[in-house]
């Protein structure tokens, strides 16, 4: 049986899946900062810049002045996503949830 996510974490899944759909990407992520603001992103793949969705979401939060994160959701990503290190650098105790494409926690 799949564990039910808290409402605020489920919202992050919805935001990440929406970013994934908009970008027609294979994965995406969303984070919530300590003020409750959310940031969602899909991977960026330019010749001059490569970011995973989680790296892009953390970068958006940090560039918006976030001083910490409460949670991060990675949809259809891998457990070795380099964005996990970015989450831990900004917020060592933040909850990190990895899900499949449908948003079911792994």
Listing of model-derived features with the role each one plays in the protein:
Residues 33:
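Short, acidic, Ser/Thr-enriched surface-loop or helix-capping motifs
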Residues 46-60:
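A short, polar/charged loop-to-alpha-helix boundary motif
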């Amino acid at each position: 049986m799949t564990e039910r996510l808290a409402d605020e974490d489920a919202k992050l899944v919805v935001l990440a899946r929406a970013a994934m759909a908009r970008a027609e990407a294979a994965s995406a992520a969303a984070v919530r900062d300590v003020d409750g603001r959310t940031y969602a992103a899909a991977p960026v793949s330019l010749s001059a810049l490569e970011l995973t969705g989680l790296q892009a979401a953390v970068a958006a939060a940090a560039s918006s002045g976030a001083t910490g994160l409460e949670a991060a959701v990675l949809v259809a990503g891998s457990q070795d996503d380099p964005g996990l290190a970015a989450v831990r650098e900004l917020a060592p105790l933040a909850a990190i949830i990895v899900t499949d494409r449908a948003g079911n926690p792994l």
